[in-house]
Structures are given as structure tokens and as C-alpha cells.
Design a protein with these regions (language model features):
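Secretory targeting signatures
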Residues: 1-30, 597
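N-terminal cap/lid segment of alpha/beta-hydrolase-fold proteins
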Residues: 46-98
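Short beta-strand-to-loop junctions in surface cap/lid or active-site-entrance loops
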Residues: 85-98, 109, 289-293, 530
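A catalytic-pocket lid/entrance helix-loop region that shapes and gates access to the active site
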Residues: 165, 190-259, 309, 316-320, ...
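Short beta-strand/loop motif that positions the catalytic acidic residue
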Residues: 299, 305-307
């Protein structure tokens, strides 16, 4: 009898064996394979991508919560208690008592702007990123929350721009969302730019409820956002106050939003710009606002890194730089974190934001627009959230999807690839015009003296696929304790920009640690280009243009007093490049997006 019963069970279960196997073994048949997605029918009628199959649930009416937070130990003169305000929507399956995970956007941008021109509050699904989560994921049984950081919208307390207070408020919101009776205890965060920074702030606090983050061009630390090897972006002087002025309502209630860090932030920019190695703010203001390093030590969740390779608002160095020159992407992978990535040639946009994937100049992503938009992004993210927030489906592949400058997509284990070859080009091989770099101390000031290096082709016979962080080791002679070089690499055959690097000579060793430089000192500036993934045709020659400033960087405060003498004959360009066959795939594209020039 027992044997007969066992046989019956085996026969009944046989049709489900493949499903069980795909769940437990990571069988790709559970979802469409990445390489086959372009063959499927995608909903391309929106301004954002859609999951392949619509969910069956609907959103219940919006609810709100005020979370009281003890802030007595975080601000010197701020309120001892503050409130975080959030709004949230539950899916209809919670009516039957089903517990659900939460996807949240944490932001300063609710009720943001001047009183007569504010954005919507948390109780209204935000345009773009909010609609994307609400329309795609609530029908699949996810709760959705919008959280206002301290000092914004209806959240009280100080507007502590990416400081400890802001992180504490975010942490309490995550804890609240994860501990509600309708919650399954799994929280994921989503968002771009500042809304990516808030994810790292949450991760730095180490909540056990926070299972995964998906920062889109997310800021990982404030100092490297505003300064690249000491070179200051123009916005570095006003960031804290610019945000504060757009979050207050200009009434007596604003007094609670003002804390010492706001005043400190007002002085931090100019002090760091001019003081270099004497900067008093590195050890307090900026270190407090570095989060990816704290998350590395305090948190054990998963990360889906998404970034635009042509994003100069939050540049790719936010994830592809790191301690001792090791990219943070590698650091997290090597430490055992579940890490996945997607890097495309878009600017400061989402992967599926097709209406913004346009008006990019040559060398700034224009050559990739025809194949740029990821209409499969919602599905890709759905598979990620299903696994990390619900425990459904196979574990996603821990790879990174990379787009080259000509639009081609491929899969790598990591980026920069650890298997690249290094090509060293001595600048002594280049025809040189000029040896001094100097200019005016104004934003984008016209350079008085520049250096032009016209170099031979990387290869006369084969295309060169640059992939990674190109290094420029520039032997230089200082005239002052200051001075700056902005380097742009170009395909001189076509005139196309390839990439850029910038450095204050006091930061010649790389990173964020300045050193005093004396007049006449000879040194090597260890410059590193922003991440490049580009194909250079065989026989195309290379030009390197050295100026005092470029893009949106400030010229050095010392102006004409600090020219830099460059010695090309003792300088090198080190180029990481791929020499082996790569695994490429085709992405689904709409006619409108593919021709969105």
C-alpha cells in the first residue's frame, strides 16, 4: 500500500519537477533569458518600461505615518525629537492577511522648490520613478512607500544634508516599514541621484529589514561627488545651501530645520576649494557624509548598481573608485556581497527613460542612442526584487551588463574587467605643442596656456576596445602649492571625445588626501580618467589636450600664480583594453527610442 501511494505521488508531482528544479537550481527557464528578451513583445507605450506580465492586485487607498525619532544625540542645537513623514500604498492581497514586501523611495524632493512652485507631496505618487514602481510592482503584491527626509515636506527636524541626522531618520523609516503587521519584513529601496544617496545612508545604518538597494546613479559619498582628486566642481560651493533653500517654506516653522551643519556646509565648499591639505572639514563634515564605506562594514544586503557612463552629475567614479585604488564595485564583490550591475551610455537618467536618451553630443553617448534604452529594465528589476524581497525564482546572475560607446551591449563578470590587458603609451612618442598649463580662476575660464599631444594610433591593424580606468601618469614641475590639469582624450581622426580626467597637483598621489607641494618640486601626477568603454578603430590617432579646467570644474583659486610645467617625455598613458571575444546580446528597442536623436 505504501509503495502504491508513493508511486501515485511521484506520478502526480512529475509535471511540476521542472518548475521545482528551476526554482532551486537557478534554471534560466524560470524567466526569459537575457539574450532572448529582444524576441518578446514589450509594452513600449509608456515613458518607462513595464514588467512582461501585469499583476492581478490593485492598490488600496494611500495611508500616512509619522514616525517619532529621538534626535537628542545627533544635533548640537536641533530638536531632541523629530518626526519622519511617509505615505504608503498596500496591494489588495493584504486584505486577506497576506504579508508583503516594501519598495520605498526616500527623498528630499517631496514638496521641493519655492512655495509657489513645489513638487507633489508624499501622498501623491511621484512622477517618473514613483509611477514606475507603483504601476509595475503594487499589482504584483508589493507595498510602495514614499519617505520625506528630515526637514522636508511634513518631516520635522533639521535638514541635515546627507549627515548623521538624515541617516538616522531614514533608518527609522526602514525599521517602521519592515516591522508593520502587513509587512513580510523585507524592504528594498529604489531611486536616482540623491534618492540613491539615501539608500546608501540607510545601508550604512545596517537595518536587518533592508534586504536590497538599487541606486541609480546614486551618490555614495559627498566629497568625491564634488571634488575629483581635489578639482572642485562649480556646485561644490553651494550644494548644502541650495538644497536647504528649496526645502523650507519661509515661515516660522523653518526654525526647526536649521542646524549647525547647515552653517558648516556653507563654509565647507569654499574652505575645501582653497585650503587643500589645510582643509579643516575633511575629518568631520565630509567623512560624516561618506556612506558606501560605512555600509560595507555595517550591512549585509544586496546591491544592484546602475549608472550612466556619460553621467557628469553623479559621475561613474562614485562606484568605480575606492580605497587604495580598488573600485567599490570590486570591493563589494570580493567581500561576498550579492552584486549586479548595469552601466549604459546614458547621462543622469534611468535605464528606461527613453525620452531623456537624446540630445547627447558625439563622445557623450550620441553614438549609442540607437541601442540605449532598456525596455526590459522593469522585468530585470522584477526578477531581482522577487528573489531578494519575496524569495521567489532563481537567484539572479551576479554579472554586469555593459554598453560600449557604439551601443553594443555585453555581459561581464565585473567592471572594470579583471582580465583586461594594459597598454602603455609613452608620451615621448607624441608630437607636443606647449609645456605649460595655466589659466584664469573662473568657472570654465579660457586657458591661457595649454598642452596638445598628438599621439600615434593604439594599433594600426586592429580596433582597440578601451574598457576601464585609463591612467595618465604625468611628470610635472610645480610652481606653487596648487595648480590643476584637466585632460581630455580624443580620437583625433574623427574629433570624437573619448574621456576626461582632472587633478589638483596637491592631490598628485591620487584619491582625496592632499600633500603640500613646493615651488620647483618634480612629481608624477597619477591621474585617472572617468570610466571608459569605447572602441577605437584601427589606425585612428589619439590626441590628449591638457588645460587648466574643463566641463563644469572650477579653475584653481591660485589662478595664474600656479601654472604646471608638464614633461611629456617622462609621462605615460596606461590604457586597459579587451583583446578576447566578448559575449554580446541584443536589447529590445522601440522605433521612437532608437531614433531619439
Amino acid at each position: 500500500m505504501k509503495n502504491t501511494f508513493l508511486c501515485v505521488i511521484i506520478v502526480i508531482m512529475a509535471p511540476f519537477a521542472g518548475c521545482l528544479d528551476s526554482f532551486t537550481s537557478g534554471d534560466s527557464d524560470f524567466y526569459p533569458d537575457l539574450k532572448q528578451r529582444h524576441q518578446l513583445d514589450w509594452n513600449m507605450t509608456h515613458t518607462y518600461s513595464r514588467i512582461l506580465e501585469d499583476g492581478s492586485y490593485y492598490a488600496l487607498d494611500v495611508q500616512e505615518a509619522y514616525i517619532e525619532v529621538d534626535t537628542s544625540d545627533v544635533w548640537e542645537t536641533g530638536p531632541s525629537e523629530s518626526e519622519i513623514h511617509l505615505s504608503y500604498w498596500l496591494p489588495s492581497n493584504t486584505l486577506e492577511g497576506e504579508k508583503v514586501p516594501v519598495i520605498a523611495i526616500v527623498s528630499p524632493y517631496f514638496s521641493y522648490g519655492q512655495p509657489t512652485d513645489e513638487s507633489s507631496d508624499t501622498s501623491i505618487v511621484s512622477a517618473g520613478r514613483g509611477e514606475f514602481i507603483f504601476e509595475n510592482f503594487v499589482p504584483h503584491g508589493y507595498a510602495f512607500a514614499q519617505v520625506a527626509v528630515f526637514g522636508t515636506e511634513l518631516s520635522t527636524g533639521c535638514f541635515d544634508y546627507r549627515g548623521n541626522g538624515e541617516g538616522l531618520g531614514i533608518h527609522n523609516a526602514v525599521e517602521w516599514l519592515g516591522s508593520q503587521e502587513w509587512s513580510n519584513g523585507h524592504v528594498g529601496l529604489y531611486g536616482k541621484s540623491y534618492e540613491g544617496a539615501t539608500q546608501w545612508e540607510a545601508a550604512a545604518q545596517g537595518s536587518e529589514y533592508l534586504k536590497t538597494i538599487v541606486p541609480i546613479s546614486g551618490t555614495t559619498a559627498l566629497h568625491p561627488l564634488l571634488y575629483k582628486n581635489g578639482s572642485a566642481e562649480a556646485r561644490s560651493q553651494v550644494m548644502h545651501m541650495a538644497y536647504f533653500s528649496s526645502t523650507v517654506d519661509y515661515n516660522p516653522d523653518d526654525l526647526d530645520n536649521i542646524c549647525p551643519d547647515i552653517v558648516e556646509g556653507f563654509f565647507a565648499g569654499p574652505a575645501t576649494y582653497g585650503a587643500g591639505e589645510f582643509d579643516p572639514y575633511m575629518d568631520n563634515y565630509y567623512s560624516e557624509r561618506s556612506h558606501i564605506d560605512k555600509a560595507f562594514n555595517n550591512w549585509k544586503g544586496s546591491v544592484y548598481f546602475v549608472h550612466g557612463m556619460q553621467d557628469w552629475n553623479v559621475d561613474p567614479h562614485q562606484i568605480f573608485s575606492g580605497p587604495d585604488g580598488t573600485p567599490w564595485y570590486h570591493q563589494y564583490q570580493d567581500a561576498g556581497y550579492d552584486v549586479r550591475g548595469m552601466i549604459g551610455q546614458w547621462e543622469h537618467n534611468y535605464p528606461d527613460q527613453w525620452s531623456k536618451h537624446n540630445a547627447q553630443d558625439s563622445g557623450y553617448g550620441a553614438e549609442a542612442i540607437h541601442n540605449m534604452t532598456r525596455w526590459d529594465w522593469a522585468q530585470d528589476l522584477f526578477e531581482w526584487f522577487e528573489y531578494y524581497l519575496k524569495g521567489i525564482g532563481p537567484k539572479p546572475d551576479m554579472h554586469i551588463q555593459v554598453q560600449r560607446n557604439d551601443g553594443q551591449w555585453r555581459v561581464e563578470e565585473t567592471w572594470p574587467s579583471k582580465d583586461t590587458q594594459k597598454m602603455t603609451l609613452s608620451l615621448s612618442e607624441c608630437q607636443t605643442s606647449g609645456v605649460f598649463v595655466s589659466g584664469f580662476a573662473v568657472v570654465g575660464g579660457a586657458a591661457q596656456q595649454t598642452v596638445n599631444l598628438d599621439c600615434p594610433a593604439f594599433s594600426e591593424l586592429n580596433d582597440t576596445h578601451i574598457s576601464g580606468l585609463v591612467k595618465l601618469h604625468l611628470y610635472s614641475i610645480a610652481f606653487f602649492d596648487g595648480g590643476q590639469i584637466f585632460a581630455e582624450m580624443q580620437d583625433s581622426t574623427t574629433g570624437m571625445r573619448i574621456g576626461h580626467a582632472t587633478m589638483d597637483i596637491r592631490y598628485h598621489a591620487g584619491g582625496s588626501e592632499p600633500q603640500t607641494v613646493v615651488p620647483g618640486q618634480e612629481l608624477t601626477m597619477l591621474m585617472e580618467f572617468q570610466g571608459i568603454d569605447a572602441i577605437i578603430p584601427a589606425g585612428h590617432t589619439i590626441r590628449i589636450v591638457l588645460t587648466e579646467t574643463g566641463e563644469d570644474y572650477l579653475a584653481p583659486l591660485c589662478g595664474n600664480a600656479c601654472p604646471v610645467h608638464v614633461v611629456p617625455s617622462m609621462s605615460n598613458l596606461i590604457v586597459p583594453h579587451i583583446t578576447e571575444d566578448i559575449e554580446t546580446f541584443i536589447t529590445p528597442q522601440s522605433v521612437d527610442a532608437a531614433n531619439n536623436q
